[in-house]
Amino acid sequence: MLYEGYLKYMKAKYGERSQGTYFMAGEDLISKLPDSLITQILLYLPIKDIVRTSSLSSRWKSLWLLIPRLDLDSEEFQDYNAFVGFMNKFIDFSGEEKICLDKLKLSSRKTVNDLPCVTRWIDFVVRRKLKHLDVECLVNRKFLEEMPLSLYVCDTLVNLRLHRVLLGKFEAVSLPCLKTMRLEENVYANDVVLESLISSCPVLKDLIILRMFEDNVKVLRVHSLTLTSLNIDFNFGEGDDFVDGFDKKVSGVLIDAPRLKYLKFQDDLSGSKIITNSGSLAKVNVVYVFNENDCADVVDIPRRNMVRNFLTSISGVSDMKISQHFVEFLYYYKDFDPLPQFCNLSRLKAEISLYFLEILPTILESCPNLKSLVMVLEFYLQEEDEPIIFSSVPRCLVSSLESVEIKKFNGRPAKMEVARYFLENSGVLQKLVLHLRCSTHEDGFYILKDLLALPRGSSTCRIVVC
C-alpha cells in the first residue's frame, strides 16, 4: 500500500526513471522520512488506505491528519451512514490532534431519511484556517443544508465553491483573502445575503454564479472593486419542484465592477440587465440575454432603452462570442434600433443558423475594425440547399478582416455561398479556414476543387481545409 503511494509520488516528482529505493531488504525506510514528505506520499493513496496507515505503529497513528488535502465523496463509501461515521471520527480525532488541512472537497449525496451533518463539518474545518473549500450537496432543494456562520468570517479562505446549499442570514461577513468564488444552484435567505457576500470580499477576482429557479433572489447585484472575471448563468434547475408565476418584471441583474475584464452572460429569465462602469471589459461571451419580446414593444420605451444600454455597455470589448440565440435576438432588434458600434472588436465568434444568416452583414458592419471571425454554421439539412443573398459588403471586409474560420462546412450550396462571400469581398484576407465535414475523401476533393475555383478579393489569401 505505502510502496504504491511512494512509487506514484516518485513518478510524479521525478518521472518514469524514479526507483523505489526506500523498500530494501525488507526494511521500512519510509517511516524514517520526515513528516512533510510522508504526507505528500499519502496524497497518492485512496482515502481509506490513508486512514489505515494510522494502525501501522505509534509513529503513524496521527500522521494521516497532517495531509494538506482531503477529497471525500459519499459515493465511495458503503452507504451514507459509513460516510457520516468516517467524518465524525475524523472530527473527533482532529479535535485531539493538530490538523494541517489546507484544502477540503466534500461531495455528499443523501436521501430524505439521511440526517443533516454537513453544516457541523464545515463549521469545524473553517475554524481551523482552511484555504480551499469545495462543498457539493446533491439533494433536492427542500433538504438543503445551511452553511454555518463561521464560513462568512473565515479569514483564510482563498477559494470557495458551494453547490446546492442554503445560505442564511448573517450578522457579519468578512472574507479578506477570498479570490475565487463559485456559487452553484444555491438558495439564499434574500437578495441582501448574496449581495453582501460578494461585496465583502475585498480581493475577489473570479466569480461564477449559477442560479436556479426560486433561489429567493429577485435582483442579483454584483458590486466589486476588484472583480476581473464574472460568469452568470440563470436557468431552470433540474429535479426541482417549480413554482408557477415567476414575475420577470421585478427580477433583474445589476453589475457594477469597474475592473471587470471578462463576462459570460447566460440569463434570459431576469427582466432587467444593467452593467455600469464597464470601461475595463475586454472579452464577453453572450449566450442568453434577450429575446424578440424585449425589443418588439415599441411603446415600452424604458425596456428598449435598457436593451440599448446593455449592448452599449459591452460595445468596447476586443473579443466577443455570441450564441445562436443572441444572433436571433439581433435579427429582430435591427428592425427597431441600430446596433452600437463595436470599434475595438478584433475577434468575433458567432453561432449562426441559416434562417438568421441575413443578419451577418449588419453584425459585421457594427465591427469596423474586425480582424478575426469564427463562425459555427448551425444549418438543418433541408436548409443547406436554400439560396442565400447577402445585401451588402461591410467595411471590415474591405479594410481589416484577415482571418475567417468556418466550422461544420460540408460544401453544400448555402455554406459554399458563405465561403464565396468572404473570398470574393475581403480585400485583406490572409486565410480562410474550413473545418470540412464530408462522408468520403472523394467528396472532400470536389469541395476543395470548387473552393479553389472561387474568385478572391485578396491575392494573398490561403484556403486551409482541416
Curated annotation (Swiss-Prot):
SUPFAM superfamilies: F-box domain, RNI-like
CDD domains: F-box_AtFBL13-like (cd22160)
InterPro entries: F-box-like_dom_sf, F-box_AtFBL13-like, F-box_dom, FBD, FBL13/AtMIF1-like, LRR_dom_sf, LRR_FXL15/At3g58940/PEG3-like
Domain F-box, chain residue ranges per copy: 27-80
Domain FBD, chain residue ranges per copy: 385-436
Domain of life: Eukaryota
Coiled coil, from the record: none
Pfam families xrefs: F-box, FBD, LRR_At5g56370
Protein name: FBD-associated F-box protein At5g22730
Species this protein is from: Arabidopsis thaliana
Classification lineage: Eukaryota, Viridiplantae, Streptophyta, Embryophyta, Tracheophyta
